[in-house]
Amino acid sequence: MTLTALNAISPIDGRYVNKTRALSPYFSEFALTYYRLMVEIKWFESLAANDTIPEVPALDNKARKFLSDLISNFNESEAEKIKEFEKQTNHDVKAVEYYLKDKFQENEQLKSCVAFIHFACTSEDINNLAYALMIKQAIAQVIQPTIAEIMGSITLLGKQHADVAMLSRTHGQPATPTTMGKELVNFVARLKRPQQQLAEVLIPAKFNGAVGNYNAHVAAYPEVDWRKHCANFVTSLGLSFNAYTTQIEPHDGIAEVSQIMVRINNILLDYTQDIWSYISLGYFKQKTIAEEVGSSTMPHKVNPIDFENAEGNLGLSNALFIHFANKLTQSRMQRDLSDSTVLRNLGVAFSYSLIAYHSVAKGNDKLQINKSALQKDLSENWEVLAEAIQTVMRRYNEPNAYEQLKELTRGQMIDAENLKKFIKTLSIPEEAKAELMKLTPETYTGLATQLVKAFS
């Protein structure tokens, strides 16, 4: 059976393949094979560039081009050849080594140097660099731009509705008014910090042999400064070097990335749940598409499916990222292999996040403010002005200010007339009374509008 979106087991490669395809160059089996091949070639080139290793001569132009072409021209057909070697070896990294040994026979200079492919390496030297590069590129090329798009769309909504007054709800009950714009930009302000941390996080990598001590390196070439050579090699690939490891790089960097992703996703979970609630309250309507159906039985339905989809996928993503952060930082003694199968699922976690991000962006595009619903809620909850009145009373030392307003408003249905009658009885300056008399739930929004306009 040919794998298609219809018969794929995972919805990542099935139903949602159009949303996740952008991650395929970084997290597919082909991608892992490609990055392993690249690391093996770059390591060989570093040996050739070290004049204290005479057995690997400096590469001539033909050899350099040959190696460069192996990387740039690598395709699925070549990857299948590596998979054929793996059928013999039952070892994926060794299969890459054998593939390169076979390829080196095609170049006059390189065929005499096949012994230096995978020289002094353990598989984890190759793998940890490959995974680090995959994560780094996926974040830079796919995840960060998509997060930035969401932040931009929420900011735009916030700016558009900067002065649209809204009844707040704390504990689900009416509270001090705000503006819709202010509540939206709050989420962007929260996202800025983890987004910046995700951009700056360094994923460490090791290249120090079977148990982290350069044992084989030193046995073969004791005169080479392997610590310096390997550190330079790792940093030349744009990664930070971890000099103190066991056989594996301890994955603390991947754990850090995972925890940052969880924080980003939790903020977006909070956002999707709030938007869902605002839609439920009628504060937002959703643009309809004529051909779409909201319910198989209720023709009138326009459901907030994009935000619900995002909520579900963010939860799936977080479950995996939390597992990565907890699991990958633990390995028995100098290593066990239980991290290997977990690492192969890195792309799954990022994919669920990406599906969710696309759903949030799609949902945002459908939102239309319903000012009449917002105004109706405000006009029915004049009791929220009790805070303003008792605070002004305190300024002028009116006795028992809080208690007076509590007695007047707590659990009561209050309208404008009730409040104005109460204000007239106060022993505060007439100017202060006049200001309170002008106050309405719709105008009692503090600096909310200014905060949105100042936000960037």
Swiss-Prot record:
Keywords: Lyase, Purine biosynthesis. GO terms for molecular function: (S)-2-(5-amino-1-(5-phospho-D-ribosyl)imidazole-4-carboxamido) succinate lyase (fumarate-forming) activity; N6-(1,2-dicarboxyethyl)AMP AMP-lyase (fumarate-forming) activity. GO terms for biological process: 'de novo' AMP biosynthetic process; 'de novo' IMP biosynthetic process. The active site is at H171 (proton donor/acceptor), S295 (proton donor/acceptor). GO terms for cellular component: cytosol. It catalyses: N(6)-(1,2-dicarboxyethyl)-AMP = fumarate + AMP; (2S)-2-[5-amino-1-(5-phospho-beta-D-ribosyl)imidazole-4-carboxamido]succinate = 5-amino-1-(5-phospho-beta-D-ribosyl)imidazole-4-carboxamide + fumarate. Its EC number is 4.3.2.2. Homotetramer. Residues from neighboring subunits contribute catalytic and substrate-binding residues to each active site. PANTHER family: ADENYLOSUCCINATE LYASE. Belongs to the lyase 1 family. Adenylosuccinate lyase subfamily. This is Adenylosuccinate lyase. The gene is purB.
